[in-house]
Amino acid sequence: MMSIKIRVRIAASLTVMALATTLAIAQTPATPASSLDTLVRAEITPFKGKVYLFAKNLDTGAIYSFNGDERVRTASTIKIAVMIEAFTRVAEGRAKWTDELVLTKAARYGGSGVLPELADGLRLTLRDCVNLMMVVSDNTATNMVLDYLTTDAVNARMSALGYKNTRIMRRIGGGGESKEGKEPDNKRFGLGATTPHEMVQILEKLEAGEIVNKPAAKEMIDLMKREQARYAIGRTIPDVPMASKYGALDRLRSCVAIVYSKHGKIAIAITVDEMPAVIWSVDNPGYLLMSRLAIALLEGLQSAQ
């Protein structure tokens, strides 16, 4: 017969093993079912181009990643970092929202926005330029803000916040290169670089009120809710509230957003790049793919609750 001492030791060992298993489960963020991965890969596999994405249910901690830690070109999503530096500068008392910025030929750049249609010499407040940068993705307004803040200051802010991958390399259209932008290895990124994972981390901190301060973070989220373009993540859910920023370059499309859906608050960052054709249309295949992926992510991450 098994001795009492042996039985006690076995029972103690089993108790420790059970406790360790319980702790491991408790400390591991919820992950989506394999069905979500199957749906995502079914969309991505036939797509002509490269796809990078990261998503997180901010209520449950459930995550999904596909190349989410790969560094990618940002296009206009880097404007989120510029916005954060502007709000921080004002909060620190080193800038005022009423500070005037002057529209010049050097700042002028087309592609999106309204300022390229207006005359040089126009004076706008810092507040106006930041609003234009985020709501209508005005490239000229962005350059005006960057001339005021500097690209190096934006990057220093990202470093201070712990974001090592998110960097702006230069002004839109060229000039104003940051220190990182002058590095040969970074030339391939053009305007800016980030990872989908890091963009979701930034969104999560903004939503939690942990960037600058709670009132400023809320104001930034509210500003992103006013973005007028819903070409990608919010394309097929027009009535669902969303705080977002999209971006477009030649063969690239990107979008980062917090979707305030019935499934919970889902933060999503998607970049598609190296598409075979340059298509300047709201029906760009990249936008269409992102809209389908967003629906799968919203439903799949909700199922992990």
What are these regions (language model features)?
Residues M2-T15:
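Bacterial N-terminal signal peptides that target proteins for export
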Residues Q27-E43, Y148, V200-I237, P241, ...:
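Structured C-terminal helix/loop/strand segments within mature extracytoplasmic catalytic/sensor domains
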Residues T28-A30, S65-R73, G113-D120, D128-L132, ...:
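Second-shell loop/turn segments in exported
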Residues S35-G68, I266:
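A short, well-structured edge-of-sheet supersecondary motif
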Residues K50, L122, V130, N143-L203:
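Mid-domain, small-residue-enriched loop/turn segments at the edges of structured enzyme/sensor domains
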Residues L58, W97-V114, L149-T150, R171-G176, ...:
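Acidic helix-start/capping segments at beta-turn-to-alpha-helix junctions
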Residues G61, R73-L101, I268:
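Active-site SXXK
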Residues T88-R127, N131:
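Active-site-proximal loop and beta-strand segments within enzyme catalytic domains
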